[in-house]
């Protein structure tokens, strides 16, 4: 036990204070920084509101909520998420046999139901299921969503975390925290999702769980501590020690379904006590009640430790770390117990909506089946019986045969069929209560739409949708396929907000955009398989941006006389660059009514339109503020069109005088390969003019992180395979836009000018 003086010195607090240590983290598209105080206050405010709402819940509501968990499984690619989920389904009795992701029986994992997923051994779409787990003489109901690990399918993680109350973060014991682990962590913070962490692949050579925990603390910047110690290492792994209860747990039976408990092996007793003390220390840093116990030099009880873990986990100040191996059928049942013990029930999570009928005032949703219905459509999918809409019920009940209203469109629709999903299978139900996840057919809506009973006009915030970073032209090989080609593109756009389609009037080509080469490759292949449309694709195109480097003023007059009423508009102001901004802003400072508000609104519209297609190379404009501070009107000839045209022309004129620059996407490239190929990978990255940021050397593999222009990355997968004998893998993630090289800028500008002639 730490001495009182040492603890106070470490916490740097007066004796009457209670400690609170939390490392703030960057999160969200705007990279806002959250301090420890603001994060803590946010949770305390949530807790206070939840306590106020609790009396509105009936005894049935509380019991229903207590036995319900909505959780997701997220991780870096190849960390074993789907294998983990397969074991969860097996141990909960949801499936009768275990099938591997790349199994020999050609069945594949249950949650990877698409043929492409089973062929490639990756998860492409998030898949939902439900199962039950018995603990402490209660049966707990889990709504479980398995999400992709590849960055190209990040929207699947976004929409899953948007509607979930908790998550299991799977980390590889060998590779530790990887690039997509950091991305998933950022997404969990964005939606305030607490998590328990499972260190998987403990049976692999080079497994080092305590190094992984250290990386969780430093790279993810969230306090973490082990609640398990492995029994045996690598291929000799046979179980784990529960350090809270000081008991050894062994998985036995053909598939690890039999749990045997016993005393802690003698050779592990010192390590168990060391890690138990570290767990209590870490909890004292983040939980007030545990800090008081610590400061009073008391030995915490098992229940006090568990309660502290639950409080700190739900408050998003801490993550308990469990260990095992999904492939070796070890440690999975312990994670199911941890989901019950440490992740929140729906009534412990504050969800809000905006009251559209009352100036979008924020209102708190009550997870009670006796209140008016409010639900969010978070995912669309084409099923055998039409469009399948996944809905999270936040308040009230959703009944088969009932009517619900789409708040965005105002349309009232009938719920003709209500189902619970089990991957690609479904089970019909008559009603779904508050806090649950279900799916329904026959509802015309978009992803992110809010539904109510019709009396309420509530709108819930949707998920974060990142910008596309890569585009390519696409056309059907046969004119006879044009109808199916159009159907496929419309469906894919509706299902996936990161998949965009546009028609380029200059080249007369259809352009598809997405999150990466694999993302678009999958959709082209799905079009061939699901719609029998073979396509030809052009060379991938990078989504560049345009900006300026210095301010510029404008004083532009638009005049047009054509015999009758003409057009007249004068606008004055300036353009200024906004550093590190992902948005454009339009502001006005016109005094004395020299430009009426209706004309200023037209100016704003002109600004928005010209920013969609910049004057330099025809790509979107980024990081510019346009200010209009003066102007003039004509009593007869001025109108909205004239001011819109004047604004567009003034923008183009001043933009070209403000040292315009082409920005290109810079990607974070993470390469993992056997150690003997490290020199080859460095040579390959140097050829791409990549800037190497970090290298981590493991027992057998190394992980190298670098930053590189997306423009140089096409074909990198082939080059990496050749350089590593097919043993290397990599991931790409968008980092930022930066000025392109002068040669590339000149080339792009010349190509654009030629295309305009």
Swiss-Prot record:
Subcellular compartments: Mitochondrion
The protein's role, per its UniProt record: Mitochondrial GTPase that catalyzes the GTP-dependent ribosomal translocation step during translation elongation. During this step, the ribosome changes from the pre-translocational (PRE) to the post-translocational (POST) state as the newly formed A-site-bound peptidyl-tRNA and P-site-bound deacylated tRNA move to the P and E sites, respectively. Catalyzes the coordinated movement of the two tRNA molecules, the mRNA and conformational changes in the ribosome.
Keywords: Elongation factor, GTP-binding, Mitochondrion, Nucleotide-binding, Protein biosynthesis, Transit peptide
Transit peptide: 1-41
Disulphide-bridged cysteine pairs: none
SUPFAM superfamilies: EF-G C-terminal domain-like, P-loop containing nucleoside triphosphate hydrolases, Ribosomal protein S5 domain 2-like, Translation proteins
Gene Ontology BP annotations: mitochondrial translational elongation
Signal sequence, start to end: none
Highest taxon above the source species: Eukaryota
Residues annotated as binding GTP: 75-82, 146-150, 200-203
MF term (GO), any: GTP binding
GO cellular component: mitochondrion
Organism name: Eremothecium gossypii (strain ATCC 10895 / CBS 109.51 / FGSC 9923 / NRRL Y-1056) (Yeast)
Xref: Pfam families: EFG_C, EFG_III, EFG_IV, GTP_EFTU, GTP_EFTU_D2
Record pathway: Protein biosynthesis; polypeptide chain elongation
Keyword Translocase: no
Name the record gives this protein: Elongation factor G, mitochondrial
Source lineage: Eukaryota, Fungi, Dikarya, Ascomycota, Saccharomycotina
Coiled coil start-end: none
Residues covered by the tr-type G domain: 66-347
Encoding gene, per UniProt annotation: MEF1
SMART domains reported in the protein's UniProt record: EFG_C (SM00838), EFG_IV (SM00889)
Family, similarity comment: Belongs to the TRAFAC class translation factor GTPase superfamily. Classic translation factor GTPase family. EF-G/EF-2 subfamily.
């Amino acid at each position: 036990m730490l001495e009182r003086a040492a603890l106070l010195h470490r916490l740097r607090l007066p004796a009457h204070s209670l400690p609170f240590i939390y490392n703030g983290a960057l999160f969200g598209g705007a990279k806002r920084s959250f301090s420890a105080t603001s994060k803590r206050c946010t949770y305390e405010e949530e807790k206070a509101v939840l306590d106020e709402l609790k009396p509105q819940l009936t005894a049935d509501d509380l019991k229903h909520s207590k036995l319900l968990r909505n959780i997701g499984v997220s991780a870096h690619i190849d960390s074993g998420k789907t294998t983990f989920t397969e074991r969860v389904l097996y141990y909960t009795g949801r499936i009768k046999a275990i099938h591997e992701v790349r199994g020999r029986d050609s069945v594949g994992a249950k949650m990877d139901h698409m043929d492409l997923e089973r062929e490639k051994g990756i998860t492409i779409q998030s898949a939902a299921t439900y199962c039950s787990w018995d603990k402490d003489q209660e049966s707990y109901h889990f709504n479980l969503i398995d999400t992709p690990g590849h960055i190209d399918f990040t929207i699947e993680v976004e929409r899953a975390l948007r509607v979930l109350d908790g998550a299991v973060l799977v980390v590889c014991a060998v590779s530790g925290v990887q690039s997509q682990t950091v991305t998933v962590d950022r997404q969990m913070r964005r939606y305030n999702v607490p998590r328990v962490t499972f260190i998987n692949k403990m049976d692999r050579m080079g497994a080092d769980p305590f190094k992984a925990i250290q990386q969780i603390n430093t790279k993810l910047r969230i306090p973490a501590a082990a609640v398990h110690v492995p029994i045996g290492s690598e291929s000799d792994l046979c179980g784990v020690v529960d350090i809270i209860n000081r008991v050894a747990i062994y998985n036995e039976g053909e598939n690890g379904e039999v749990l045997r408990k016993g005393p802690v092996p003698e050779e592990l007793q010192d390590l168990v006590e060391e890690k138990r003390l570290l767990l209590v220390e870490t909890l004292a840093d983040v939980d007030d009640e545990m800090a008081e116990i610590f400061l009073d030099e008391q030995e915490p009880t098992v229940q006090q430790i568990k309660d502290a873990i639950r409080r700190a986990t739900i408050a998003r100040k801490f993550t308990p770390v469990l260990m095992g191996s999904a492939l070796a059928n070890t440690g999975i049942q312990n994670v199911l117990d941890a989901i019950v013990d440490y992740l929140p029930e729906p009534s412990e999570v504050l969800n809000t909506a905006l009251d559209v009928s009352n100036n979008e005032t924020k209102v708190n949703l009550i997870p009670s089946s006796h209140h008016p219905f409010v639900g969010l459509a978070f995912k669309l999918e084409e099923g055998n019986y039409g469009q399948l809409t996944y809905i999270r019920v936040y308040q009230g009940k959703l009944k088969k045969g009932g009517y619900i209203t789409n708040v965005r469109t105002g349309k009232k629709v009938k719920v003709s069929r209500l189902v619970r999903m089990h991957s690609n299978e479904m089970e019909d139900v008559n009603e779904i209560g508050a806090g649950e996840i279900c799916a329904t057919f026959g509802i015309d809506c978009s992803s992110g739409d809010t539904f109510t009973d019709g009396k309420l006009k509530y709108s819930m915030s949707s998920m974060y949708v990142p910008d596309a970073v890569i585009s390519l032209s696409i056309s059907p090989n046969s004119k006879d396929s044009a109808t199916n080609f159009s159907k496929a593109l419309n469906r894919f756009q509706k299902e996936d907000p990161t998949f965009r389609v546009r028609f380029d009037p200059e080249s007369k080509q259809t352009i598809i955009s997405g999150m990466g080469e694999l993302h678009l490759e999958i959709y082209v292949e799905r079009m061939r398989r699901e719609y029998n449309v073979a396509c030809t694709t052009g060379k991938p195109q990078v989504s560049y941006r345009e900006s300026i480097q210095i301010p510029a003023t404008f004083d532009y007059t638009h005049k047009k006389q054509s015999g009758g009423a003409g057009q007249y508009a004068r606008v004055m102001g300036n353009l200024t660059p906004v550093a590190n901004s992902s948005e454009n802003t339009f502001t006005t400072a016109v005094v004395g009514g020299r430009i009426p508000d209706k004309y200023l609104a037209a100016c704003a519209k002109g600004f928005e339109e010209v920013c969609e297609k910049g004057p330099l190379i025809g790509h979107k404009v980024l990081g510019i503020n346009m200010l209009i501070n003066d102007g003039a009107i004509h009593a007869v000839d001025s109108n909205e069109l004239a001011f819109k045209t004047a604004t567009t022309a003034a923008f183009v004129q001043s933009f070209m005088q403000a040292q315009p620059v082409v920005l290109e996407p810079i990607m974070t490239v993470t390469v993992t390969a056997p150690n003997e190929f490290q020199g080859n990978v460095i040579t390959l990255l140097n050829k791409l003019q990549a800037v190497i940021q970090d290298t981590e050397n493991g027992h057998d593999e190394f992980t190298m992180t670098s930053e590189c222009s997306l423009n140089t990355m096409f074909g990198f997968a082939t080059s990496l395979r050749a350089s590593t004998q097919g043993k290397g893998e990599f991931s790409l993630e968008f980092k930022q836009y930066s000025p392109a090289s002068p040669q590339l800028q000149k080339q792009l500008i010349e190509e654009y000018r030629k295309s305009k002639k």
